[in-house]
Design a protein with these regions (language model features):
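Core segments of cupin and vicinal oxygen chelate
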Residues: 9, 16-59
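Vicinal oxygen chelate
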Residues: 1-8, 12-20, 49, 51-54, 62, 65-125
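A short alpha-helix capping/helix-coil boundary motif
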Residues: 3-7, 28-30, 64-68
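A short beta-turn/loop motif at secondary-structure boundaries
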Residues: 43-46, 68, 103-104
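N-terminal beta-strand motif that seeds the catalytic metal site of vicinal oxygen chelate
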Residues: 1-26, 74-76, 123-125
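Short alpha-helix boundary/capping motifs
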Residues: 57-59, 81, 118-119
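Short, low-complexity Ser/Thr-rich regulatory SLiMs
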Residues: 42, 64-66, 124
Length: 125
């Protein structure tokens, strides 16, 4: 990969999630993590074919599930300024607890499962 070219603003590896109700996933990430919408292509008036958000300097791509493209979930690890605050925002936006905030050897960490079945490991140091 000596001549690898990556478009500006992207990483070499990026998660690509297929979720049910991608528009609600977009709102969840904005409300909980401060995500910024970068791109959105609609399949129909209500279904997202492809979308991208930025959280910090990272990109997550996602789309609505279809009969051809089944739901694909992920476990995501995210550093935040305040684990407890983001954890509470997640719960307020429909997430459930995987692990309540607790001090760990690597920082303060919590786990939530969002309404789309993705697990987010939230950590502040």
């Amino acid at each position: 990969m000596e001549n690898l070219k990556i478009p500006e603003g992207y990483q070499q590896i990026m998660p690509y999630l297929i979720v049910e109700n991608a528009a609600e996933f977009l709102n969840f990430t904005k409300n909980v993590f401060g995500a910024v919408e970068r791109h959105k292509t609609m399949r129909t008036e209500t279904l997202i074919m492809h979308a991208e958000i930025s959280i910090g300097n990272c990109v997550i791509m996602f789309a609505d599930a279809t009969p051809e493209h089944h739901k694909q979930n992920a476990g995501l690890f995210i550093y935040v300024d305040n684990c407890d605050t983001v954890y509470e925002k997640g719960l307020a936006n429909g997430a459930t607890t995987v692990m309540p905030p607790a001090d760990q050897s690597y920082g303060r960490s919590a786990g939530i499962r969002d309404p789309f079945d993705n697990t987010w490991w939230i950590t502040s140091v």
